[in-house]
Every structure is written in C-alpha cells, then in structure tokens.
C-alpha cells in the first residue's frame, strides 16, 4: 500500500518523486519502504503477475492430402513464443500431419477422411495452449461409367457441405456441374460428370462449398473418355454466322433411327461436337419422341415402337445411361385396368410423341386408342379409327384422370384421312388457368382442354386453326393458318387470357383458298414458324411474327422455341427435296433473330437421319449455364 503523507499520491512515481516522498515521511525510508516504492515504479503492484493466454487462427480448417494450411498463434502476457504440436505430438508426424515452427501444417496423405487437432503451447508456460481442428478430406475418386463420355466423381465432404465438379481440357477447367449436397448424417457424394468430347483427356476437380461459405478444392484428376463406332454417330455440321452470337448452351437432339445409328438422344456443343449420347438398346423400331431434361438431372424419354405397345416405353435415365424408372405400354394398360378414374377402363396402343411433367409431380402422357367406327363420311364400310387419349399419372404413375378425343371431337372431320384421325403430338400445361393445351397434327388444330389440375370435365374450351374458333388477324384465312403443326408452346404469361403461342407449321395439305385447294399437287408446300398472339375473349389470333424468309418444306415433325436471348430456334425435321414431297433424309436446325426479316445466327445440318426435335438447353445440369 502507499504511504500516507497527508497529500494525494502522484499519478506517476519518478525517482525525484520518490526522494520527495522520503523527505515527507516521519522516519527515514526503510529497505522495505524502498522496495515497495520500487515495486510501484516497476508496475508489479505488490507481486501480481500478467495472465498468459494463447489462441490460434483459424479455429477450424479443411485440408486435402499433403495440402498446407498456415495457422497463427497469438500470445498475450508473454513474448517467449510457442511450441506447435499435432494430436499431442510435438511437430506432428506423417500419420497425423506435420507442423513447423511458423505454424505451417501439412496434412497427411489420408485415404479416408479424418481430423487432427493442431495446438500451440506457450514456451514460458506450456500449460497455456490454444487449439484448432483440421478436417482432412481424402482425395476424390474418378471412375468410368457405362457411358464412355461420363465419369463418376466420388468424394466425402464435411457435413453441411455441397459438392460440384469443374472440368475441362486443361487445368483452367471452364465448365462445372451442379451442386450436390452432402447427406445430412455425413457420407460420400457421387457426381456424374458429363459434357466431354469423345476420345479426349479432361481434367477435373471437386469444389466443396463448406457450411461457412468458404470453399475447398480437391486435387486435380485426369479422365480420358472413350470412343463410339463411327457408324453409330450422327453426321452433324454446325455453323455460326459471321458476327452472330447464338444463345449459349448445348443442343439436345432426339434422333429418329436411320441406318446404323441407334442413338436415340444426343447432346452436342454449338460446334457440333457430340458431348453425350443415349442408346436405349430397345428391340424393334423404337424411336425417341421426345427427350426432356428433368429437374433432378435425369432425362425422360418416350419411345414409340411396335403397334402392340410392347416397345412403346417411357424411360427415366441418369447421365450414365442407367434406367431408374420405366413404363411400357403394356404396364400402362395394367394400370388403367386397375384405376378407379372415370373413363380409365380402356386399352391403349401405347404412348407416343410427347409428355408433360407438371409442377405437382404428375406426368401427362399421350396414348393411342383404336376404335372401329361405321357410317363415317367417305368410309361406307367399318373403319378402324386411331384417336388419342390424354392420361394424368400421379407421382406413383397411377392413372387419375383421362381425356379421350372420341368423347369430344367430330369423327367426320378427318383432314388427313383415316385411320390416323387425330395424331396428337404435343401436350403442355398452362399454369395460369390449370388447363392443358394439345396440338393435333391431323386436325390442324391446337386445342385447349378444361383440366383444372385433374378436376376438370375435359371440355374443349377452344379450337385454334383452320375451321376453328378464332379469326385470323394480320394474315389471310385460310392459307396463313398452320397445318400439320408440331410443338405448340406458350411463350408469354396468360393471366389475362391474352398470350403468345409459338409452333412449327409443317404445312402439309395447306389450304390455299376458299374452294379448298391444297398445296402439294401444283403449288409446293412450305413450312413456317409463326408466333400468334391469342385473345381468348375476342377469339382473335394475330400473327405477330413469322419466319418464312427462306421457304423449306418439312413434311413431318419439327419444333420451335423462343430462346433466352430473344432469338427463335426451330427444327426442320423432315426436309424434302426442294420442290417435291420426296424425303431428303436430313434435318436443319436454325437459330434466327426475332426480327423482320429474321437473320440466321446459327444452324446445324443433320445428315442421313432426322431430328424429331431440337432444343437449346443451358447445360446438362439444371440451373447451370454453360
């Protein structure tokens, strides 16, 4: 304690203060008094010692095999430094990892995930320590799959992480997969890596997005893709117009098997290089129509095959080509026989042409139904009529709703003859009013059906096209209507009953005048790609835009889509020899500007076979843009 001098003690005690202090005390300073005063000067304050504390930064880290992580030790109350250890072993060892005097920790070459504790102890007082936890991630494993262009990348990330793979022809990579989250309880994650050229070496590495939003990079791996027989590959020639900028992404083709090519689905880059294929290896003459990328990263395909329905198959496959679900026409008939829904107790020939996956997980499919009819116009004898049914399958693929063309349309209207009466080739869902819109090629109509998410009565709300419910604006009726069309799709919101519809107008038997003259006999048929603005209240259809600057004739199939960049892409599937109805055994896919006149930005020629549909998709992974 301070001596009581009768005056406040000075804030700072110097040697001169100490002398003056001694003069004011009644007795001379004793050794003890001097020691206490000197203690005050030195800051010991009666023998109290400064507390030592050690902390390490970062508190946790993720490291790969042999990767170096630098830790920093902060010591308060001492300047003598620290000694480093790993799992209690001074400087560590090859099993747990090593750490040098500067805090540089080198992870061990672990074959499985493990953890290590890095510690720093004060040299002055070894009981004062700080520690950090290191999660050591074993290198990923890359393996081949049944698809020679797809690798399976497996790695075990920390809990709460997500895994994506970046890959490319060198270590700058360039492409990435989507993110796959780690299992909640921990465990390995496998990602199928697709989008690589045939017979090429690629580099790839996993990117782990950790729970704290930091990232960890796996080591680089090399993978070499395989080859396919040259005779099985499509003949493709892709060209970008000089100065043109096509919509980025990849091209998804579903091909009609011709000759030796049995590949049902093909994905290419915009240079025409094949990046992914699927061979269904189905017997008979099954062909894909169509193939669509699902939100889970799988492809859903519909195959139209033999008329007995055995080879009419729907398949869901992953990128490696493994079938995860399938349903044959025969299995659909079994489900229909057991279904309690109204009208479901029928027999169908098989699924065909299109399907729609609904937001609630239901699947809408098109199937054929045959009936023998009598007394039809132009057919004095009984005749088999092939109509269509639209079937709603729930999440378990059980039929819960059915619509039949026989219940709603006039059998005496058969523009393209019999038995193929309706030939429905498109079904889409209208989310704004919960209706279904279908395209009937052989009626040259697009129909809207009261579906109401499975509660509708199936009433035909309107018929769009020649002899339908709408009047044509900005065009001449009947020749500017669409005929034998494909791939009708909504390209704008429909909340007010006014929306735009895009389709591919094949143009078969186009009616040229009021007397019913059709193309083909004298006037060549032409295909078009119109955008129609529909007003459901006034029942008007206004031609907003049409591509017919370079007339060509596709006598069957085809597709048309509005791209993200505003351009329009369409597939002239069944091209014919110019000026004739003779098939040319080729298809042309074009991306054009949405201008008048349209300008071609990009095109692909498919030689020796046909592309039933062609779609530009962002990548092989939902939500990822390449």
Residue ranges and their predicted role:
Residues 65, 101, 112, 198-199:
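Surface-exposed loops/turns
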Residues 32, 38-57, 131-133, 137-141:
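Bacterial Sec-dependent N-terminal signal peptides
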Residues 79-92, 131:
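Short, well-ordered beta-strand segments
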Residues 138-228:
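Short, surface-exposed linear motifs at loops/turns and structural transition points
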Residues 207-213, 220-626:
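Histidine-/acidic-rich catalytic cores in large beta-rich domains
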Residues 123-131, 212-217:
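Short, exposed coil/turn segments at beta-strand boundaries within extracellular/luminal domains
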Residues 116-118, 204:
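Hydrophobic beta-strand segments within extracellular beta-sandwich modules
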Residues 100-113, 192:
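Extracellular/luminal low-complexity segments enriched in Ser/Thr/Pro
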